[in-house]
A protein has these predicted regions:
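Conserved D-loop-proximal element of ABC-family nucleotide-binding domains
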Residues: 8-9, 21-29
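GG-anchored amphipathic helix commonly corresponding to the ABC/SMC/Rad50 NBD signature/C-loop
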Residues: 1-14, 38
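C-terminal lobe/lid and adjacent interdomain/linker elements of RecA-like ASCE P-loop ATPase modules
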Residues: 26-127
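Short, glycine-/Ser/Thr-/acidic-enriched flexible segments
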Residues: 4, 21, 68
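Walker B catalytic acidic pair
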Residues: 17-18
């Protein structure tokens, strides 16, 4: 609903924070597709935990939090192609990334047209 109603907004940048909470599977793919379409009209930033949504993105970053001496630290990392495959695989399969989850991640990225050889504009290395 948030994605659909934002189409009428005239702002150049849209930010979605976990717009995909409580969904999965086919619905997640639809949300990812709709976000990608919105990205053709304006800049879209989306926080997601779903690989189906992340795989639709043109660019992907990994955000992580750690706590040191009672202080919470946040880090953000732009993902190059190989790191993106590993992150999608982690999202698919959990902590232990296997050859099978890596292959599944590659297939998901290729199928969505967001990986080299499939029309991607992802950089080959991190900035």
């Amino acid at each position: 609903i948030q994605v659909l109603t934002s189409r009428s907004a005239s702002v150049p940048t849209l930010i979605f924070d976990e717009v995909d909470v409580g969904i999965g599977g086919g619905v997640a793919e639809i949300v990812g597709r709709l976000l990608r379409e919105l990205g053709g009209e304006r800049q879209v930033l989306c926080v997601t935990h779903l690989p189906q949504v992340a795989a639709r993105a043109e660019w992907q970053w990994q955000v992580s939090k750690t706590t040191r001496d009672s202080v919470t630290l946040s880090a953000i990392e732009s993902l190059n192609d190989e790191r993106r495959v590993r992150e999608i695989a982690r999202m698919l399969g959990g902590v232990e990334v296997t050859d099978i989850t890596l292959e599944h991640a590659r297939e998901l990225l290729h199928a969505k047209g967001t990986f080299p050889g499939a029309g991607s504009t992802m950089p080959d290395s991190e900035p």
